[in-house]
């Protein structure tokens, strides 16, 4: 009976573990360890951060709120606590910055000196040349633009062209007005005919008297 119960419990546990994934989180570097690394700066101070194992469906489930996955490394980090996710896909704990090939270097040290400890050559694209470089976070969304900004051409001048103001002379011009020709109605011809007829009659009467 007990054997069956233990077997059932083992199956349940294995089923739960099968649903959960195995994750690791970057261990915080203690201030004491960082001070010791800075003290050994002449001999090199780079280090590969340690990790702690955990189980869960994701980083938050395995280690708590604030933890995120660093690239596809299966290693979680907490940016709210100052951890960094390097551009090469590995995390560095708070108080350090990204070097290369999984190495981190304490803040305030020369990255070239840190890389020299393990005969690591910094990539040509490594741009942290100051004494307090900061790690380049791994892109977690849209790919950031590469290269410097470029000119898009000289801006076109803006403004308004001058406009001519004023009024054109209007003036008044009186042209000759045309008059319509008289309309012929035929009345003048009729009067003339009557006058001619009367003259003929009068002439005839005069001839009779003579």
From Swiss-Prot:
Glycans are attached at residue 94. It is found in: Secreted. One of its GO terms (cellular component) is extracellular region. Keywords: Glycoprotein, Secreted, Signal. Residues 133-182 have a biased composition (Low complexity). It comes from Arthroderma benhamiae (strain ATCC MYA-4681 / CBS 112371) (Trichophyton mentagrophytes). This is Uncharacterized secreted protein ARB_05178. Residues 1-18 form the signal peptide. Residues 125-186 are annotated as: Disordered.
């Amino acid at each position: 009976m007990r054997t069956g119960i233990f077997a059932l419990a083992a199956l349940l546990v294995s089923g739960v573990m099968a649903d959960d994934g195995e994750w690791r989180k970057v261990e915080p570097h203690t201030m004491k360890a960082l001070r010791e690394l800075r003290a050994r700066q002449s001999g090199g101070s780079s280090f590969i951060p340690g990790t702690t194992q955990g189980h869960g469906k994701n980083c938050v489930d395995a280690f708590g709120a604030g933890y995120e996955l660093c690239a596809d490394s299966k290693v979680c980090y907490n940016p709210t606590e100052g951890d960094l996710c390097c551009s090469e896909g590995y995390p560095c704990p708070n108080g350090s910055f990204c070097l290369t090939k999984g190495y981190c270097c304490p803040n305030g040290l020369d990255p070239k000196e840190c890389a020299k400890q393990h005969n690591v050559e910094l990539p040509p694209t490594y741009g942290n040349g100051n004494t307090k470089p900061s790690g380049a976070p791994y892109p977690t969304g849209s790919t950031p633009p590469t290269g410097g900004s470029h000119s898009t051409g000289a801006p076109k001048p803006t403004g308004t062209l001058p406009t001519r103001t004023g009024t054109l002379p209007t003036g008044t011009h009186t042209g000759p007005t045309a008059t319509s020709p008289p309309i012929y109605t035929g009345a003048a011809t009729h009067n003339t005919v009557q006058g001619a007829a009367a003259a003929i009659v009068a002439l005839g009467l005069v001839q009779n008297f003579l």
